[in-house]
């Protein structure tokens, strides 16, 4: 269906260009950056950054690793996440899957962005506030292919998603 294909493409672009950068900013500031510093140390990370050939990418990596985002950048990212969550919740109230009546790449992309949201931002995503998002996340998490992917992980990430195992 042409309309479904359009919606899939629209949601993919929305997530990649609107939500992903905002989720990423929060993720790097509060989780990834501090964990990278604790695991590898500043000296080792600086050596890796200095091997990046483009100076502007070095600046971007330092900003991410050290959480050097301004208050304005964090506020705008928070606003974007709030808008995105509202849009996802509304769209998922229309059908089982995000962009069509069938599981699609939009669902894969969305799950990879949003699976940790109930844990990292529970005030924005929980069973009371976003029942459609929670239903959708749990449905994707129960898929055999998703389970197999999680088994391949080498970190404790899978242990953080107990909330998705609830019904």
Task: Name each region found by the language model.
Residues 129-167:
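Long, positively charged, glycine-interspersed low-complexity recognition regions
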Residues 90-102, 144-149:
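Surface-exposed helix-capping loop/turn segments at secondary-structure junctions
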């Amino acid at each position: 269906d042409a309309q479904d294909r359009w919606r899939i493409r629209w949601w993919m672009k929305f997530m990649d260009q609107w939500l992903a950068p905002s989720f990423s900013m929060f993720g790097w500031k509060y989780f990834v950056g501090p964990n990278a510093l604790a695991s590898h140390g500043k000296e080792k990370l600086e050596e890796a950054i200095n091997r990046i050939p483009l100076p502007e990418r070095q600046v971007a990596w330092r900003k991410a690793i050290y959480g050097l985002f301004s208050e304005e950048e964090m506020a705008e990212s928070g606003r974007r996440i709030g808008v995105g969550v509202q849009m996802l919740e509304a769209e998922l109230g229309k059908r089982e899957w995000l962009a069509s009546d069938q599981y699609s790449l939009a669902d894969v992309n969305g799950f990879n962005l949003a699976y940790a949201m109930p844990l990292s931002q529970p005030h924005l995503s929980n069973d009371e506030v976003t029942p459609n998002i929670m239903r959708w996340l749990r449905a994707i998490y129960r898929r055999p292919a998703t389970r197999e992917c999680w088994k391949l992980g080498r970190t404790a990430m899978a242990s953080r998603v107990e909330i998705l195992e609830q019904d």
